[in-house]
Each structure stands twice: as C-alpha cells, then as structure tokens.
C-alpha cells in the first residue's frame, strides 16, 4: 500500500466509530481530509460537526455538512483526527498543520478520541518530528529562550505562518521525548505559551493505524 492508500483505509475504518445522530469533532490535516471525504457519504446520519480549523470548516461545508460552533453544543460523541507521531502509549505529537490549540480544545470536550494515521507515524520515542508550540507573538523570543533552558532542543519560529488564533508557531527540533506528560506540562507552564503539540495528558483512546497488511487497531492502556 502507498501512504495515501493507508490514509484512505484508516479514514474508511474511522466511519465505524461515528456515532449516529450526534455531533462529532473533526481534526485537521491530510489524513483527516480523507476522513472528511468519507464522512460526506454518511453525512445524513449525523447532526453535524465541530471543526478544529478554518480549513476543516471549509472542507466540511463544501460537502454541505453542518458545522457548529463549539459553544453551541454540550457534548461531542467522538473526535477523529490524525497525528504527526504516536508512541505505543498513544501519546501524540500534533500540530504540523498549526491547529494544535483548537484541536486540543475539541479533543478535551469529546467523549472519545480516535486517532487515524499511517504506520510511518508510530514510533518508539517521539521527537523526530519537530514539536510545535503555539505562542503569543510578543513572547516568542522569551519562550524560545525558556524552552532552550528548561526543555532543550532547538526551537525556531515557523516562517510565514500565523495560526487561526493569530499566534506564532515555534517548532522544536532535536528532542527525545521519554516522558510526554511531564514535557507537556512543563511547556504549558512557560508564560507566553498558548498550547503545545503534545497530546499526552489527553492522548488518543484508539489508534487506527494503516499498514501494508490493512488497518491495525491499537487501544490505549489505562493505568
């Protein structure tokens, strides 16, 4: 299977986790786009969706899928999104597309988080993919310094990119993330950080992993 064929396969598999007659959360990225395309075929079975980015909203609306504002709803049955990296514990790095803050909010509200990815995203130790951190623009230099001193790695400002919230993204290279929950909490404690791309304190519940042998289902171990 090619990478796109794996993404297509997990997108189709994710449809089985869509709860009928509810509002679902939809993430951002290339794999999620495959899911939106698949979702269009069963759009009449759901009430609508919450989009994690402007790009996702546009794609959903192009299929006439109703998009709700998060403040209009009380619950989201399931959140379906991709990942840039995942470890065996279903801790994730996300935010390659720059939508990490909104993705975190929607994931926090959802009853269940289903991650869809191809097999190249599953790693033993995360960090080869640069870790995105959304920062207030006026604090970018301060945050870069604090990351270098307190976290390590090499943070750089993502060029020519502004988030949907009007902020900057720092991408941290040269990390080996052995304790994702601790690093997520430490990054969030730096003044000026809006959010970081570690989804560990609220990781995925289920990973649908596209492989050359089909879709593998990986479940988060509790405890």
Curated annotation (Swiss-Prot):
Organism: Ruthia magnifica subsp. Calyptogena magnifica
GO molecular function, one term: ribose-5-phosphate isomerase activity
Domain of life, per lineage: Bacteria
Coiled coil segments of this chain: none
Entries under SUPFAM superfamilies matching the protein: D-ribose-5-phosphate isomerase (RpiA), lid domain, NagB/RpiA/CoA transferase-like
InterPro entries xrefs: NagB/RpiA_transferase-like (IPR037171), Ribose5P_isomerase_typA_subgr (IPR020672), Ribose5P_isomerase_type_A (IPR004788)
Pathway it works in: Carbohydrate degradation; pentose phosphate pathway; D-ribose 5-phosphate from D-ribulose 5-phosphate (non-oxidative stage): step 1/1
GO biological process assignments: D-ribose metabolic process; pentose-phosphate shunt, non-oxidative branch
Binding site for substrate: 28-31, 81-84, 94-97, 121
Key word Zinc-finger present: no
Positions annotated as active site in the UniProt record: 103
Subunit structure: Homodimer.
Disulfide-bonded cysteines: none
Annotated catalysed reactions: aldehydo-D-ribose 5-phosphate = D-ribulose 5-phosphate
Keywords: Isomerase
Gene behind the chain: rpiA
EC number: 5.3.1.6
GO cellular component terms, A-Z: cytosol
Family label: Belongs to the ribose 5-phosphate isomerase family.
HAMAP family in the record: Rib_5P_isom_A (MF_00170)
Function: Catalyzes the reversible conversion of ribose-5-phosphate to ribulose 5-phosphate.
Protein name: Ribose-5-phosphate isomerase A
